[in-house]
From Swiss-Prot:
Propeptide boundaries: 628-650
Signal peptide segment: 1-19
Region of interest: 2 X 40 AA tandem repeats: 339-423
Protein name (database record): Alpha-agglutinin
Keyword annotations: Cell adhesion, Cell wall, Disulfide bond, Glycoprotein, GPI-anchor, Lipoprotein, Membrane, Repeat, Secreted, Signal
Glycosylation sites: 79, 109, 135, 248, 282, 289, 299, 303, 306-308, 311, 314-316, 329, 331, 334-335, 338-342, 345-346, 349-350, 364, 402, 485, 501, 614
Keyword Thylakoid among record annotations: no
Species of provenance: Saccharomyces cerevisiae (strain ATCC 204508 / S288c)
């Protein structure tokens, strides 16, 4: 049993020792602004600042960083638990922050601590912003640190530091003493309220004696007066907010009971001395106002008029405890390796950065940031045919996103710049359909087509697609032709359209019984009696990082057979166009199909009287915006391609 307890204690000690301070953190950009129109140090203020952790790779759960702030009376957060959580955009709780020490009237410094709620070692850096409410300690008692701070603060512009890394110039207003009594009060953070009253004022002379009665709970809010905390002294040395910088003892008779304090002083106070009282009261939960009722009766000697006069008055002072504010935002950059395997035996390894941002609690603050991403992808596809296609692509683009998190409206605009380099070696697949004869006894030419497509164009320094083609056939009447058309377009600024035009040459061949003497008429065989079909499928697949553009094709087909993306000498012209329009996407599969389909004449037993070879010029136009462009085939040809590719791959 003793050994078991030793193990428990050892594990507990180990857990405490494993939590380390995060020292590689910097604080900057401090802004201190007033919460109210009253710009005195002991009133409410808002502090906002940035923090940055340059190397987050060693941060584990339980690690923490602390900001120590002298001259700060207390920090006040929004919720009742007095904690603030800073989360990332993916929902990960990065830090939970709390006030580990309120200086109040007890300590020299107020400390603010943030503890890591999760293992954050997967992030390279963490940057964020923190906002909370505070008030400064500028005196009001005989407590050691409050008395020191009464001498520190001055009215007017003043450089105020929070910690040892950041500071801000704050313009403090002085306090006016226009009545017979001056009041001040603030909550301590320890379930109590500290109040200060200054009175027994005798202008043009000195104080002869009198009484002062204070009810610290005139509204019956169950506020208890801490009689042991009562301080009754005199002073004529005050700072700009009428708090004593030094004080003198008195022989006052002090009676404390319940929420009441009675003070009787039968001695003279010279040279502008006045009587001040400091006391602590309990602060019940959910109590936001505290009312003090004061009664004064005292006698003064006017040395100028050489007269003695009595002053008697009563007043009520209401203290309102303001609600605290806090706001926390954070962004992180992560680095990790991901591996993906597809049915094409493709392995993609990418090292890249992701960015996130979030807004926690309440407040209204906008944070703009730029996150740079670098992506490198290397893909090697196992060859399945003899025709090679090499595609090199480099793309640079930017995207925008807005995120709003928390109870207040908080928008963070994020600009992400991505640089991606893709190098691929892809093989094509050739599928040859068997030759068959139906309803035709004459001579027949069999066409076997092989199509090689490679392409290159430039959009904003981004290589994309143009075309070339090689056609081979056993028919000596058709000449082997290699056509290559490349169009380059220089980079243009973002949000300006870029147009890339490429020309694809195609062959439409017709089997007909057209007579040479009558070029304007011909007859054709029924489409149902096809002779042969030879198809070549070239499939290239790549994954660019840019959003894609959809391409749709308008084509005019003849009634006989059609060669798509093939070239030869021809006597006629026909055309179809492809137009690219902007759309969103992250992957594009490009399929090019060439087909040769022969149909016989309707005359039984006749020979093909001639071949009409129809040259088709294909115009491809790609419209890009903000540097985003790629190709995706759709419409009728796209549907055929998709079915063919699905059949081959699956």
């Amino acid at each position: 049993m003793f050994t078991f307890l030793k193990i428990i204690l050892w594990l507990f000690s180990l857990a405490l020792a494993s939590a380390i301070n995060i020292n590689d953190i910097t604080f900057s950009n401090l802004e201190i602004t007033p919460l109210t129109a009253n710009k005195q140090p002991d009133q409410g203020w808002t502090a906002t600042f940035d923090f940055s952790i340059a190397d987050a790779s060693s941060i584990r759960e339980g690690d923490e960083f602390t900001l120590s702030m002298p001259h700060v009376y207390r920090i006040k957060l929004l919720n009742s638990s007095q904690t603030a959580t800073i989360s990332l955009a993916d929902g990960t709780e990065a830090f939970k922050c709390y006030v580990s020490q309120q200086a109040a009237y007890l300590y020299e410094n107020t400390t603010f601590t943030c503890t890591a709620q999760n293992d954050l070692s997967s992030y390279n850096t963490i940057d964020g912003s923190i906002t909370f409410s505070l008030n400064f300690s500028d005196g009001g008692s005989s407590y050691e640190y409050e008395l020191e701070n009464a001498k520190f603060f001055k009215s007017g512009p003043m450089l105020v530091k929070l910690g040892n890394q950041m500071s801000d110039v704050v313009n403090f207003d002085p306090a006016a003493f226009t009545e017979n009594v001056f009041h001040s009060g603030r909550s301590t953070g320890y379930g109590s309220f500290e109040s200060y009253h200054l009175g027994m004022y005798c202008p043009n002379g000195y104080f002869l004696g009198g009484t002062e009665k204070i009810d610290y709970d005139s509204s019956n809010n169950n506020v208890d007066l801490d009689c042991s905390s009562v301080q009754v002294y005199s002073s004529n040395d005050f700072n700009d907010w009428w708090f004593p910088q030094s004080y003198n003892d008195t022989n006052a008779d002090v009676t404390c009971f319940g929420s009441n304090l009675w003070i009787t002083l039968d001695e003279k106070l010279y040279d502008g001395e006045m009587l001040w009282v400091n006391a602590l009261q309990s602060l019940p939960a959910n109590v936001n106002t505290i009312d003090h009722a004061l009664e004064f009766q005292y006698t003064c000697l006017d040395t100028i008029a050489n007269t003695t006069y009595a002053t008697q008055f009563s007043t009520t002072r209401e203290f309102i405890v303001y609600q605290g504010r806090n706001l926390g935002t954070a962004s992180a950059k992560s680095s990790f390796i991901s591996t993906t395997t597809t049915d094409l035996t493709s392995i993609n390894t990418s090292a890249y950065s992701t960015g996130s941002i979030s807004t926690v609690e309440t407040g209204n603050r906008t944070t703009s940031e730029v996150i740079s991403h670098v992506v490198t992808t290397s893909t090697k596809l196992s060859p399945t045919a003899t025709t090679s296609l090499t595609i090199a692509q480099t793309s640079i683009y930017s995207t925008d996103s807005n995120i709003t998190v928390g109870t207040d409206i908080h928008t963070t605009s994020e600009v992400i710049s991505d640089v991606e380099t893709i190098s691929r070696e892809t093989a094509s697949t050739v599928v040859a359909a068997p030759t068959s004869t139906t309803g035709w006894t004459g001579a027949m030419n069999t066409y076997i087509s092989q199509f090689t497509s490679s392409s290159f164009a430039t959009i904003n320094s981004t290589p994309i697609i143009s075309s070339s083609a090689v056609f081979e056939t056993s028919d000596a009447s058709i000449v082997n032709v290699h056509t290559e058309n490349i169009t380059n377009t220089a980079a243009v600024p973002s949000e300006e359209p870029t147009f890339v035009n490429a020309t694809r040459n195609s062959l439409n061949s017709f089997c007909s019984s057209k007579q040479p003497s009558s070029p304007s008429s011909y007859t054709s065989s029924p489409l149902v009696s096809s002779l042969s079909v030879s198809k070549t499928l070239l499939s290239t697949s790549f994954t660019p990082s840019v959003p894609t553009s959809n391409t749709y094709i308008k084509t005019k087909n003849t009634g006989y057979f059609e060669h798509t993306a093939l070239t030869t000498s021809s006597v006629g012209l026909n055309s179809f166009s492809e137009t690219a329009v902007s759309s969103q996407g992250t992957k594009i599969d490009t399929f090019l199909v060439s087909s040769l389909i022969a149909y016989p004449s309707s005359a039984s037993g006749s020979q093909l009287s001639g071949i009409q070879q129809n040259f088709t010029s294909t115009s491809l136009m790609i419209s890009t915006y903000e540097g985003k462009a790629s190709i995706f085939f759709s419409a009728e040809l796209g549907s055929i391609i998709f079915l063919l590719l699905s059949y081959l791959l699956f």
